[in-house]
Amino acid sequence: MVKIGVCDVNEDETRRTVYLLESQMKNDVIDKDNVTIASHTLESVMLDLDDQRFDYDIFITELSFYNGRNGVELAKRINKAAPSCNIIFYTNKIPNELDIYESRHVNCMLKGRHDGRLVMTTGRLIEALMSEKSKAFIKIRFDRNIIILDCREIMYIRVEG
């Protein structure tokens, strides 16, 4: 199962992006049987990251939020918490003061002009995640926390207690 998270400046923008993806799922452009899409506010994503409950495979986010917050800082936190997460910046405009390459992401595109590219990129990511390449990461759930580890960095696992 591939989990996609969407976070935007406001609920209307988030709903629009979710609707765009879901409409393509109905048209069989995106595999609907193995995909779940969830919408978020910036605050709910931050809470999930703080509580170690963030476990999305693909995360689509805006670059410019209110109160001086930005998607690059959010992406950096996601990179640390969930290194296997594929981040897509889907934005109204790319601010000159932001360096989007400070964080690891797979694509950056403008809303409206690149809607088709968002659907195509998301579809390709889903296909890649469903293949064997995605097996390089494991999710460990303990209590209510989720930890995502890169298998190549694990030397051994010791179980205590």
Range-by-range predicted roles:
Residues D51-E132:
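CheY-like receiver
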Residues V2-E22:
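Conserved acidic segment of CheY-like receiver
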Residues M120-G161:
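Conserved binding/recognition cores within well-folded domains
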